[in-house]
């Protein structure tokens, strides 16, 4: 982003996305800039309803279950709203430290998903279940997907796979669709393929 001329502001990891959003709002007000607010704009889920969701039902003959991570909630909400019309059951994946499953909020290393509060446009009626994943499982899957499938994904994708695998144990059969929303190229400066929970992941 810096190479493209962006003014990059970093916030404390302990502040989570709430801290990042606060910094963005302050910046927008100070410099009369546009704050896109993916966490509050209905354009976020609507974009997925009219693109990804329709693509899934057009290209796949049948879907029984949909599994996706939730950060802003845009992907899950937009896709789940559409899939409910097809009697698909929809499941959220979150890391430990996210509050969607009722647990306490704390820092986690799985990036791109996890919420300190319930996203404003995430309708609870769309949610058929929530899987809370350990960071280590997410990163183990990052390495597994690279080694076995040649997929270079990020930790939120590893968590999504873990959620799909956990669901598979429960349902025995049926078509499960999940989303890999990020690539490992975004995290090459970190130890993404050699993650250890006991080490600092910076």
What are these model-derived regions, one by one?
Residues 40-41, 71-74, 94-99, 105-106, ...:
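Glycine-rich beta-alpha junction loops
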């Amino acid at each position: 982003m810096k190479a493209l001329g962006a003014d990059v502001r970093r916030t404390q990891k302990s502040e989570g996305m709430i801290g990042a959003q606060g910094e963005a709002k302050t910046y927008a007000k100070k410099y009369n800039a546009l704050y896109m607010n993916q966490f509050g704009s209905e354009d976020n889920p609507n974009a997925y309803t009219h693109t990804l969701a329709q693509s899934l039902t057009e290209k796949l003959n049948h879907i029984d279950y949909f599994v996706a991570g939730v950060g802003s909630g845009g992907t899950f909400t937009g896709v789940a709203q559409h899939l409910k019309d097809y009697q698909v059951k929809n499941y959220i994946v979150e890391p430990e430290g996210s509050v969607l499953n009722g647990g306490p909020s704390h820092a986690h290393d799985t990036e791109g998903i996890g919420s300190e509060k319930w996203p404003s446009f995430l309708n609870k009626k769309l949610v058929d279940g929530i899987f809370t994943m350990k960071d280590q499982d997410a990163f183990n899957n990052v390495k597994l997907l690279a080694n076995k499938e040649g997929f270079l994904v990020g930790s939120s994708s590893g968590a999504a796979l873990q959620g799909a695998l956990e669901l598979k144990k429960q349902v025995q059969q049926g078509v499960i669709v999940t989303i890999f929303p990020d690539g490992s190229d975004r995290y090459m400066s970190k130890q993404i393929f050699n993650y250890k929970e006991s080490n600092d992941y910076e």
